[in-house]
Regions:
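Serine residues within intrinsically disordered or low-complexity segments
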Residues: 10-13, 27
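Intrinsically disordered, low-complexity serine/threonine-rich segments
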Residues: 13-19, 105
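Short amphipathic, helix-prone segments within low-complexity/disordered or flexible regions
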Residues: 3-5, 9, 17
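Short polybasic linear motifs
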Residues: 7, 21-24
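A cross-family phosphate/adenosyl-ligand binding-site feature
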Residues: 26-146, 152-222
């Protein structure tokens, strides 16, 4: 079966032909960078890759050194299995990769999970590895950057770094569970956050449980 391909349409220009204006539209396959770093919650990155593959989105994957260690510790997946979910993969030390340049067009980047170290590196422009550099490119090009920050409790440093990035236009999206959808399994909890992440890119996840506005049906609430 042929896999679906997600295309994004973007208006480029108007041209005058035979006395009338014609709208010229350029389409491109959606491209999203996915980074998995060393915080707990590697399954979030894996599930995002799975959902993006199902949606036909082209993905560019970077797994940090500690991200790879955490992946093996927390999930049943090998690094090779996770990399097989992506369209392209890069080593974290490959500073010459396509995603290190702003001229390589993408629709954005998600770091899931995002460690406190990665958060600090992106906030302060360290650029010491490809995850930092790719995120720096996304920020300077004014593209969508989503950070699934996994840390608790949060220190002043963490909060200030998140505020700094939010002011730059990044979306800080910690993996907060929702209970209005009555999750039954860990997968349900993970899927809720993944759906919220993909919402940021205008992508709909099949079967996502969303708030309907109904509460306490058949019950009196003070």
């Amino acid at each position: 079966m042929t896999e679906p391909v997600r295309w994004r349409l973007s208006t480029r220009s108007m041209i005058l032909v035979g006395g009338g204006w014609w709208l010229v539209v350029e389409s491109h396959r959606m491209k999203i960078i996915v980074a998995i770093t060393g915080a707990t919650g590697a399954i979030y990155g894996v599930r995002i890759l799975q959902r993006l593959r199902e949606a036909g989105v082209e993905t560019h994957l970077v797994i940090s050194r500690w991200g790879a260690r955490t992946l093996l510790h927390e999930t049943p997946f090998s690094r090779e299995q996770v990399e097989a979910l992506a369209t392209e993969t890069y080593a974290p030390a490959d500073m010459g990769a396509a995603i290190s340049s702003g001229s390589f067009r993408t629709d954005g980047m998600v770091i899931a999970p995002c460690s406190a170290k990665t958060l600090a590196g992106v906030a302060h422009g360290f650029g010491e590895n490809l995850v930092h550099r790719a995120a720096d490119v996304i920020l300077k090009e004014r593209r969508k950057l989503v950070l699934v920050v996994r840390e608790a409790p949060l220190s002043d440093i963490h909060l200030e770094n998140m505020l700094k990035l939010s002011r730059m236009g990044a979306v800080v999206l910690p993996p907060m569970p929702a209970f209005y959808n009555h999750p039954r399994t860990v997968d349900d909890v993970v899927d809720h956050t993944v759906a919220r992440v993909l919402d940021q890119f205008g992508l709909e996840v099949s079967g996502a449980e969303r708030w309907s506005g109904e509460m306490g049906v058949g019950q009196e609430v003070d």
